[in-house]
Amino acid sequence: MDNEFTRSMWNYPFKLTYRLILREKELHFNIGVYNPSKDHTFSFNLLLHTYFKVPDVRRCQITGLHGCTFIDKTRDNQIFQEGRDVVTVCEWTDRIYQNTQPEHIITNVVSGRKMRVQKYNFPDTVVWNPWQEKARDIPDFGDDEFPNMICVESGHVSSPVILLPGTAFEASQILQV
């Protein structure tokens, strides 16, 4: 909502809609941002912080990232190319994968199931786990919780969305078990 409070943090008129649809085995996320200004362009980044509960993060596999370049935030933002067919996490991980596939499969999610992540207009995918050393630094994160979670986050983070006056941006994500 565009109001005095939001203007104190970000001085642009805007309209944001966020719609969630829950179905039996699916969760849909739809987000829209509209720039009602007649004169001003603005830019922003967007990331859906999706935390998945897993039995053991070391046994999870993520598809749809092979061949993508990624920014490794654990290694001074160096850029690498992903050579693995499936990505696994066995250490502190904070990566921004760029120009990723519109679908990822995450294996060994809750009860050993697969989670399908389908995304539209989110070119980036962040894979994150704080591991033991970083989990201690997060106040609302238990020191022993890192093995039971993984973040696979759809976003528009490596380059901003630029909204010209009177234009809109829409993106969506569907999670399926």
Predicted regions and their residues:
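Glycine-rich active-site loops that engage anionic ligands at enzyme catalytic sites
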Residues: 108-150
